[in-house]
Amino acid sequence: KQNIIKYYFPDMNSEIILETFEKRLLMQRYAGNTIRSYKDYASIFLKHVSKYPSLEEIPLSDIEAFINEKVQNGKISVSYQKGLVGAIKKMYELILDKKIQLDYLYPKRSFSKLPKFFSKEEVRNILDNTQNLKHKAILMTIYSCGLRLSELLNLKIKDIKSSDGIIRIHQSKGNKDRIVSLPDKLLATLRHYYQAFKPKEYLFEGEKGGKYSERSVQLILKKALIKANVQSEGSVHTGRHSYATHLIQSGIDIRIVKELLGHENIKTTMIYTHITDIDKQKTPSPLDFL
């Protein structure tokens, strides 16, 4: 009876279901970005099944038909398909305390695209052409520490351990803390930035205090790419890809790179070795110099 009271939803009220889903994801300490993704996927699914009186009455065949229609029409990527199926499974688990078998709906083949990255020369141009001290500090921190956008925005002043030469990154993806090195060049820039802007809690704060916004960082990078005349498109995550790629190109052990990036599985890190393999293919043969 307790389970019925706790998990049963008398009608297909998407708003209540999504609100409850969010609360239970929060209770399980999922990251903010993960919760938003789960909710977005769940919302799309709930619109499709709104004709049913409750979640419990949706047949698995209709869930399969929903995913199949998306795939057959070429409307979704492999990663989107994985996310959609995963969100539906998680919603049933947390809302109805029910594990549904949907593994056969996951794509079996992975068509991973090689991540885009900036060349070392492009990174140098981006930083050299960024005159605003705060903007330069932000871009330099992303690249020199291989940070995700959320990790950058969550950095606090106390996380910068200048005496130890490290930066502590709290509750990154997978809810695991990690430590990255604090390069001397970055430390010098951050000291100048701190003296000029005097942030109170977060390393990078908005005009009225509090966390700097995602949109602001994205605009900073966009303008920096234009000023540096970098033709290739790039996002904040491209800075992280560049960090990883340049480390491996410099001969840093893949296992160390894995820890620095905060990857749970080394297979995720291995994608960067494919990029360096392409570079090796471009290496001239000694015959070319004869």
Regions from the PLM with identified roles:
Residues 1-290:
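Conserved catalytic core of the tyrosine transesterase superfamily
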